[in-house]
């Protein structure tokens, strides 16, 4: 079969798109973490610790930037998972009890814009689950949003607003986070060897 020049040009123009469609992948938290580490934070971070509680609250990825600031990234795989995040303790400052008229006490809670010691906060999720009405479900208007397309490429949909009052971490703290990062690495390596 001989193709005309026009048909050949058309075939060349559509080939990469057909190939890309065959590369559609399932977006998992592990894939999102890998893409964030290798593409977005590759040159902007000193340390990236998965599943870290160091800052006082759970972070799926805790990033220490080159200027010694913390970025907290939550990896979400469903809308329900994103909506539940608003209830996490890291988004609330709880103070003393307040007495009510009926004699019962309630705890005074104030919403926070950033988790404790965190400079920036992001939610990362597949683009397929994101709708613009989910902005109202975010625990903070300062949170950034990173969306992953069908091929697994991350794109910053909305930049995070920094907490200017968040302190830089000390070198000793950075060393402690590096130790945690290496412990996570060897834990994953052991799991990999046992499977």
What spans do the regions from the language model cover?
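Non-catalytic C-terminal interaction segments of nucleic acid-processing enzymes
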Residues: 19, 27, 37-38, 130-195
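Acidic-basic catalytic patches of nuclease active cores, encompassing PD-(D/E)XK
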Residues: 14-57, 64-66
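Surface-exposed, flexible loop/turn segments at secondary-structure boundaries
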Residues: 69, 80-81, 129, 151-153
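Active-site beta-strand-loop-beta-strand hairpin of nuclease catalytic cores
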Residues: 59-72, 76-78, 116
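Catalytic cores of nucleic-acid endonucleases
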Residues: 77-143
């Amino acid at each position: 079969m001989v193709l005309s020049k026009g048909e050949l040009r058309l075939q060349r123009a559509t080939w990469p798109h057909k190939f890309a469609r065959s590369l559609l992948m399932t977006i998992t938290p592990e894939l999102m973490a890998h893409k964030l580490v290798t593409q977005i934070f590759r040159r902007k971070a000193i340390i990236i610790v998965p599943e870290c509680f160091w800052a006082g609250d759970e972070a799926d990825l805790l990033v220490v930037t080159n200027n010694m600031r913390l970025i907290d990234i939550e990896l979400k795989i469903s809308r329900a998972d994103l909506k539940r995040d608003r209830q996490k303790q890291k988004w609330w400052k709880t103070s003393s009890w307040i007495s009510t008229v009926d004699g019962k006490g309630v705890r005074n809670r104030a919403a926070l814009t950033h988790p404790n010691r965190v400079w920036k906060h992001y939610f990362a999720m597949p683009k397929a689950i994101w709708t613009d009405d989910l902005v109202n479900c975010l625990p903070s208007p300062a949170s950034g949003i990173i969306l992953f397309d069908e091929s697994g490429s991350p794109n910053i949909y909305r930049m995070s607003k920094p907490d200017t009052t968040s302190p830089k971490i000390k070198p000793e703290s950075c060393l402690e986070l590096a130790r945690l990062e290496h412990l996570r690495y060897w834990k994953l390596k052991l799991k990999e060897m046992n499977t």
